[in-house]
Amino acid sequence: MSSGRRLFDSHFHVIDHRFPLVANQGYTPPPFSLADYRAATNPLGIQGGAVVSGSFQAFDQSYLLASLAALGPGWVGVTQIPDDSPDAEIARLGTAGVRAVRFNIVRGGAGDFDRLEALARRCH
């Protein structure tokens, strides 16, 4: 489909069982690999998007970094990181294409609000 418009998928998950997953309140999602995503969205002509870490991926970055490397320019990551993440790790994620950090207060083990505020300031 070519409409002359640039399409950006603002929120999608890659669930690749080659990488660590953590059951979230007893739920582990079914596989949805990057190949599955591409097959499902190829007819739409999507040219970029935001790969979002789910709570079931905890603080593991390996799947996200692999996905961003495979997707290339135009794609960004949204991740979850512990509130004690070193500045060097935050910078490394930024270099790899991570552009946002999400704080999953209920299911993601994000920590308390004061520590999250400090982390948010370091990320920004």
Residue ranges of model-derived segments:
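Active-site gating/metal-coordination segments in enzymes
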Residues: 58-124
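An N-terminally biased module of ancient metal coordination in phosphate/nucleic-acid-related enzymes
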Residues: 1-59, 63
